[in-house]
A protein has these predicted regions:
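Surface-exposed flexible segments
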Residues: 171-185
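Bacterial Sec-dependent N-terminal signal peptides
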Residues: 1-29
Length: 268
């Protein structure tokens, strides 16, 4: 009977131990014995934000124009821009076969290297172009309030290489390829030769993943979550005297709206 009592005590202690482990905060041990498993974007995002912790979220589509003074560190130096971000992305895809590229933003249509090269080098009339003529980099990100960390986060999802209409024989802009942002970060953090160039102090140049995570670029908002999935430019009235300028101003107003949201969040 005494031995039976000892067995009962051991069983109770073991059960209590597992129960205590099960109640450990999932933020401390998210993959342990927790009673909840949190969904998380591990395909596109470089940030570990649990879906259940997204208290507020809106998607934003932006464009970086590498010709702008603030973005010259990404554009590269010299006339051919061989040390710029566009050429380094090309090398990562073609020379190293390290970045998977897609034809659509749903990432359902992978591109072969040959298809990527054709999209990259040939304009609509079949003429070859130069790397420096590719100066648009678009990307999609989510503006998220992470309630677990009480933090507002810009969570980039993918990058889109775009051929400008002028480069594309004035036949309209062309999507060259889509790249997962997580793949982009994982590649360039291990390739320090590809750098955001600090022209004032070369020793403080950064890898592309550091530059993007530090938001060392200037971009304009082209689209945000809306019922019609319309670009900001498409929402400008047709009778506007200067629709391009109005679209730019509307994008800027949206930027200020995000800043105001962040400011108001902590006001109370």
């Amino acid at each position: 009977m005494k031995r039976f009592g000892q067995y009962v005590c051991i069983v109770l202690l073991v059960a209590f131990g597992f129960g205590a482990e099960a109640q450990v905060a999932t933020s401390v041990n998210p993959s342990g014995f927790g009673d909840r498993q949190f969904a998380m974007d591990t395909v596109f995002s470089n940030k570990r934000i649990r879906e259940d912790d997204k208290m507020y979220q809106i998607s934003v589509w932006r464009r970086i124009d590498l010709r702008e003074k603030y973005n010259l560190s990404l554009y590269g130096s010299g006339d051919n821009k061989a040390n710029g971000i566009v050429n380094h992305i090309y090398k990562a895809v073609v020379d190293d076969n390290a970045l998977e590229v897609f034809a659509d933003q749903n990432f359902t249509k992978p591109l072969s290297i040959a298809e990527f090269q054709e999209n990259f080098w040939l304009s609509a009339n079949g003429d070859s172009i130069f790397v420096k003529q590719l100066y648009y980099i678009d990307f999609k990100e989510d503006f998220v309030f992470d309630r677990h960390h009480s933090d507002l986060v810009f969570d980039i999802k993918f990058i889109e290489l775009v051929m400008p209409s002028v480069t594309n024989a004035n036949a309209g802009q062309k999507t060259i390829a889509y790249i997962r942002y997580k793949d982009f970060v994982n590649y360039f953090k291990n390739h320090p030769e590809a750098r955001w160039l600090n022209f004032q102090n070369i020793s403080k140049s950064l890898t592309y993943d550091q530059a993007f995570e530090s938001r060392l670029f200037r971009s304009v908002v082209r689209r945000f979550t809306n019922p019609d999935e319309a670009l900001i430019a498409d929402m400008v009235r047709a009778d506007n005297a200067n629709p391009e300028m109005q679209a730019y101003l509307n994008g800027l107003a949206f930027e200020y709206k995000l800043l105001e949201f962040e400011n108001a969040l902590w006001e109370w």
